[in-house]
Amino acid sequence: MDIRISSEGINISPKSKLKIQKKIGTKVEKLLAHLSQDLKTGHLRIEKLKYRQYKANFEMLLPGKNGRIVAQNINHQLLTTVTGLREIIERQITKYKNLTFNPKKKTKTTTLN
């Protein structure tokens, strides 16, 4: 899983970037194991807001009609923000998989005359 991390108002050390990539990437990798590696690219943007808050935005495009994964989380601690973001991403990917690979079958009702 390739996660491109950019930041605004904060310098993120390489060690922290590695932690963030591991925290998000491992779970997303497991959920999207059926896709090829080049399709699993996400963009993570981290901003430092006023009052010591961190805002994390994540975007990822997957194949299919419902393939846009977008998540946002705000918290006072950077890693807690990333953990909350990961949970949102997990829910959205699960929803994407259910809609794409297990679509509800439309059944036709027949009327008896």
Annotate each language-model stretch with its function:
Residues M1-N113:
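N-terminal, polar/charged subdomain of small-to-medium soluble alpha/beta proteins
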